[in-house]
Amino acid sequence: MAKYVIGSAWPYVQTVPHLGNMIGSVLSADVYARYLRLRGHDVVFVSGSDMHGTPIEVEAIQLGVDPAEYAFKMHGVVAELFKRWNISFDLYTHTHSETHVAFVQEFFKRIYENGYIFTKDEEMPYCPRDKIFLPDRFIIGKCPYCGYERARGDQCENCGRLLDPKQLVEPRCAVCGSKPEWRLTRHWYLDLRRLEDKIRKYVEENPHLPQNAKEMSLAMLKEGLKPRAVTRDNKWGIPAPFPGAEGKTIYVWFEAVLGYISAVVEHFKRLGKESEWEKYWRDPDTKIIFFVGKDNIPFHVIILPALLLANGGGYTLPTTTASTEYLLYEGDKFSKSRRWGIWIDEALHLLPADYWRFILVYIRPENRDTSFTWAQALEIVNKVLNDDVGNYVNRVLSFIKSRMGGVVPPPGTPQEEDKSFLQAALQLFKKAERHYEAVELKDALHTVVEIAREGNRYLNARAPWDLLKTRPEEANAVMYHAYWSLKMLAAGLAPVIPESVEKMWEMMGRPASLTWDEALREPAPGVKLGEVKPLFRKVGEDEVKKMLQALEQMKREKASKKYPWEQALL
């Protein structure tokens, strides 16, 4: 049994996440954490709401509310939605917790004492109208690299490059649109230059990093790492702990990534095992894996390891950052302003959570940008989830229920065809295992579905309904092996569609606790089945048209409400 810390990128609670955010981090992390638990590993799965920083402060100013009120209300909304999506966090917290604030301040004090922090006076954009400095998202302009018109002062969300406000072309205040002035202010910087060789070694020698994470990180290293300001002039954040830094806060990205540690601290504190966290974050054998979209790669592959090294506290460096490409919606980027896409609160009013989980993992953008389309979603639900998976489960269990007394038959007299089918199912199951281990979640799901397809072909070829009349022992063998394959199917699908598999396992008579190893064990004859009902249903084209109409209505209703927490559909 290995120890794992699994972290999904902390959602910024300025708004509700959309489907792309979901598959890029939270859902992917949940699938992997559930798989690891099925394998019997010791897993701590954490995340939390990213509460601080300029976007929330800007939005709060524009709405006339306190940033803390805004952040806490949105945290409650997002936490509730993740529950409804069946996300199995061990702890979902937030960056304004006492534990996180104290941890971040002590962590940066140590970096300062180690000599990796220096001060520099420099000109920063200042809005004379609003009388505030304009860090990060307080300032927008054209990206100097890709030309994106609404790049932020810290990063371009279009090309992912880290930016400095002075690099923006035609900058303007995000609050009022005014042209900024440049005024002198003092900031505290992390000297990334002194850590560059160690970071390069970490990236180059890491065999687990996905291609996009490695390529983006090596490109940044090739350009040379530059010192990055760890303080900001905005008010809503964690007060900087450095001497003379009164009135400054820690830059949101530098403190949010430390949440992966502070959340584990908080988790064990809640369990009354306060020092237990060190067995995870200070044990070199612990596997630490983050799930993020590609725009978050620099902060997880460069910045966080740099912070851990600069702190010198014996922290284990992350094993990998499982980064996805972007999910598009009908060929275009999600856009709240253009009402383009589906947000996770809207989705649950259209289809059950397991349907969405299955669709998103089935099309997970692992190697290239992928587009969600309703046509493809319809095909996945109707042909894959219902016809391939649901139909096979129903065929096997309904036959045993109606023709074999509702109990798992004895192994009977297996023929070569039965042995061949079992071997094929086992090989697919082990192949799915390899994909899960490599965090290739889409390929893992596609492989698990093949077990059901193989099973449907097997039943058609062996025709147990005919064998039952003349060779009942062979019919027993067929249905025994088919039932065994359902155990593999259940284990393989459980990380993706947990609620449906729970129902499936109940129908199968709960032969044992569902684990990965249990799927490989021969079934015990005589297990009594539960009530057998179809697991899934088809979705018609007319129903999709109604869904799209309902989606538009939801978006109109949202737009009519002032506050984001009122807009969320709970």
UniProtKB/Swiss-Prot annotation:
GO terms for molecular function: ATP binding; metal ion binding; methionine-tRNA ligase activity. The keyword ATP-binding applies. Binds 1 zinc ion per subunit. Its EC number is 6.1.1.10. A motif ('HIGH' region) lies at residues 11-21. A motif ('KMSKS' region) lies at residues 333-337. Its cofactor is Zn(2+). It holds the Pfam family tRNA-synt_1g. It is found in: Cytoplasm. GO terms for biological process: methionyl-tRNA aminoacylation. Zn(2+) binds at C143, C146, C156, C159. Is required not only for elongation of protein synthesis but also for the initiation of all mRNA translation through initiator tRNA(fMet) aminoacylation. This is Methionine--tRNA ligase.
